[in-house]
Amino acid sequence: AFSLRTSFSTRQLTELEKEFHFSRYLSRARRLEVARSLRLRDAQVKVWFQNRRMKQKKRERERWPDP
């Protein structure tokens, strides 16, 4: 079974980015709180953070390429 891709609103993205800026990892309790406040499922917030960490890692690799 697959799930449909989530389209986040501008407000949701802004809040998720703010949260990510504060901490790259969320505790389960905080994740549930964020999900509830943004009207998202816990799993959507979890996956967004996983993807955002990978995006950050990629940006850092591009900025500092291996010699």
Curated annotation (Swiss-Prot):
DNA-binding region: 1-60
Keyword Nucleus included in the entry's annotation: yes
Keyword annotations of the record: Developmental protein, DNA-binding, Homeobox, Nucleus, Transcription, Transcription regulation
MF terms (GO), sorted A to Z: DNA-binding transcription factor activity, RNA polymerase II-specific; sequence-specific DNA binding
GO (cellular component) term, any one: nucleus
Record's subcellular location: Nucleus
PROSITE patterns with a match to the protein in the record: HOMEOBOX_1, HOMEOBOX_2
Function field: Sequence-specific transcription factor which is part of a developmental regulatory system that provides cells with specific positional identities on the anterior-posterior axis.
Family statement drawn from the similarity comment of this UniProt entry: Belongs to the Antp homeobox family. Labial subfamily.
Protein's recorded name: Homeobox protein Hox-D1
Organism: Gallus gallus (Chicken)
Lineage of source species: Eukaryota, Metazoa, Chordata, Craniata, Vertebrata
